[in-house]
Amino acid sequence: MRRAAVSAVVIGMVLLGGNAAPAHAEPFVDIYTGKSYTRDADVRIRQKGLGNDFRVEDVAFDDDSFRDPPYYGGRVGYFFERYPWLGVAIDFVHFKMSADTSETKHFTGTLGGAPLDARLPMNTIVHRFDITHGVNYVTVNGLVRHSLLTDAERFPHGRIQLFAGAGLGPVVTHAENSIQNVQNHRSYEVAGLGVQGFAGVRTMLHKYVGVFAQYRFTRSDLDVRVPSGRGKVEEISHHVVGGLTFSLPDF
């Protein structure tokens, strides 16, 4: 799946970039909101001092995209003067993962040093496993675009622009969890390295202002703090994103 996603982004970059029309350099800023869909995943809890090392299989996650603070993000980038179809950008996005602990799940491993292999309501042991103050991606990205309906005066970069890109960077999390009635110490931490790929369309309403919509894919192996130990989960998410885009004069 990962190879297919990367291949799709690379092919998209080649196709979009290869047919782009000349234009001037362009700094830009995007602000956006959206909704994420995180795939079910196993959660592993390791609390060495307590004799706990167990896995909860196929945990479902709610996105809580519209709960305060909602899904939000911003991107600052630059398309090059010599290669106006090619750009770079720094992207920040905040979304959430909240485990549905009411469901019955398969537990395997050890609990209190004793073997554990049973189907139990997740909240029998893990009362809460949330990352609600953020799965926060900070990525450096390469991107390409293909300009349509260009006008030298009003829309020099194209009134409609197809774009695609990919990047990677640290994932900063703020986990909130409770295991066997003990809550974790809550704080921000770098929980892993994340990768993303995206593709979308940008429509300019004015020479310097427009709107855009895009699909985003993210993946990371998160390692977060739990009481007296660590919790691990593979985050694979699909996102639908929309917002405002601002094309800035190239000073």
Where in the sequence are the language-model features?
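Gram-negative (and chloroplast) outer-membrane scaffold detector with strong preference
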Residues: 75-178, 241-251
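Predominantly the C-terminal beta-signal and adjacent terminal strand-loop region
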Residues: 42-44, 50, 54, 60, ...
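C-terminal segment of classical bacterial N-terminal signal peptides
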Residues: 14-22
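Outer-membrane beta-barrel translocator domains and adjoining extracellular loop/strand segments
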Residues: 42-47, 100-106, 155, 174-183, ...
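Short glycine/proline- and aromatic-enriched beta-strand/turn motifs that initiate or cap beta-hairpins
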Residues: 23-80, 171-175, 239-251
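Residues that define the transmembrane beta-barrel architecture of outer-membrane proteins
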Residues: 68-72, 134-138, 160, 189-195, ...
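Extracellular loop and loop/strand-boundary signature of outer-membrane beta-barrel proteins
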Residues: 59-62, 124-131, 180-188, 225-233
